[in-house]
């Protein structure tokens, strides 16, 4: 098993398929990346040289926003929504559905998780009283 830009890939996978497992790279970007580097369509991960793997990582780092950068951006967007008290920010805080889904009979999993979270907090609050 090898890692390319933080994503695990099996040695028998094609480069195109393995690169789509990286957050931020879809099928079209994977094909573009392969063409820009001059890598064949059917080449597998274990057939790549160290130099080719380094080239792939450099190209991804230069041109694409991937994994930790995406996660950081998403978290910053959510924090911004919460800080300006937008409806979506409040729903994020509550753990409720954001996009108008029904909550009376649905979203049971989210409600269970909220309930479990409150149960964990109760004994701590009672201990401080």
From Swiss-Prot:
According to its UniProt record, where is this protein located?
Answer: Mitochondrion
The UniProt entry's coiled-coil ranges are none
Gene3D superfamilies, A to Z? 1.10.8.50, 30s ribosomal protein s13, domain 2
Assembly notes: Part of the small ribosomal subunit.
Q: Is RNA-binding one of the keywords UniProt gives this record?
A: yes
| GO MF terms held by the record | rRNA binding; structural constituent of ribosome
SUPFAM superfamilies cross-referenced by the UniProt entry: S13-like H2TH domain
Q: Which organism is it from?
A: Zea mays
What biological-process terms (Gene Ontology) are attached?
translation
Tell me what this protein is called. Answer: Small ribosomal subunit protein uS13m
């Amino acid at each position: 098993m090898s890692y390319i830009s933080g994503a695990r890939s099996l040695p028998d996978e094609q480069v195109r398929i393995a690169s789509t497992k990286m957050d931020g790279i879809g099928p079209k970007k994977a094909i573009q990346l392969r063409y820009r580097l001059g890598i064949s369509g059917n080449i597998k991960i274990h057939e790549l040289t160290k130099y080719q793997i380094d080239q792939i990582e450099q190209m991804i780092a230069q041109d694409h926003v991937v994994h930790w950068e995406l996660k950081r951006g998403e978290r910053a967007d959510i924090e911004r929504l919460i800080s300006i008290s937008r409806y979506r920010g409040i729903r994020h805080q509550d753990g409720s559905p954001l996009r108008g889904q029904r909550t009376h009979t649905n979203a049971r999993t989210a409600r269970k998780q909220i309930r479990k979270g409150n149960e964990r907090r109760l004994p701590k609050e009672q201990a401080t009283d």
